[in-house]
Amino acid sequence: ALTFHQGRRIQVRSQESIIKEAELIIKDPDFKGYINDVGGPTANFRHPSCQKQLKVGTCKHRQCLFPSPCPRIDADHSDYIALLRKLRALPGVKKVFIRSGIRYDYLMEEKDGKFLDELCRYHVSGQLKIAPEHIAEPVLRHMGKPGKDVYLKFVRAFAKKNREIGKEQYLVPYFISSHPGCTLTHAIELAEFLRDTGRNPEQVQDFIPTPGSASTAMYYSGYDPFTGKKVYTVQNPHQKAMQRALMQYRNPRNRALVREALKEGGRTDLIGEDSRCLIRESNYRSRPQTIRRSKNK
């Protein structure tokens, strides 16, 4: 949907415009020295995709990063790094954070790793939000998102860099349930991934159709507009609730829905006492009976 808001070419504010706004913020009496987010929909993608784009515009039938990065892509973060350094150098500024909008697929195309180093050293406030959105490959294809392997590659690179610089910082991934193309099997696959990576999301996002997006076209038509092939869509509220519950299977309130989803998905092997199971065989642990004594005795 960003294409309809911004056009097919990445739109960026000039460094001068951003610095001018930062200077206004600094003058505020309540300013404590922290610029909370120099991000956006595509925070680190400020540079033209390639030299060809500068000459003839964007490609009509190709995307820069999906389904795989174009060989011509020029992943250059020098402009962004320069901007961040200028912001850090402003009098009165203690920290400049990037809290959202990092395109990790674009970041991983960088050859020298300068931006990842700069990001981890100066611009993460303990946690960095990123948006893999799912991990099942068929769902990611319908989303137009990079594959699970790209996400895991970034997770490893982020962890390695933080070890090198002696910092303890974390990634907060954002996932979506019930996206077009996401079956109950895919939802269970995501739940297992959350289990294996020790994730316990407090907030999850159920897919909401919004005007102007390919995902919404799939949701209402049941077809992929790019291939013409049928796409499974979750329309039933109860089915949507089951997919959402699987993402928060540790929440006791979701046990009944998770149990139903696992049975319907043919994954009763994930119900039991084993460490890999999502829920226990019984919904509630048996509690020892207590004998209440009268106050008079």
Predicted segments, located by residue:
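Conserved catalytic-core segments centered on acid/base and nucleophilic motifs
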Residues: 7-9, 18, 24-26, 193-194
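A generic structural motif
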Residues: 172, 201-209, 273-275
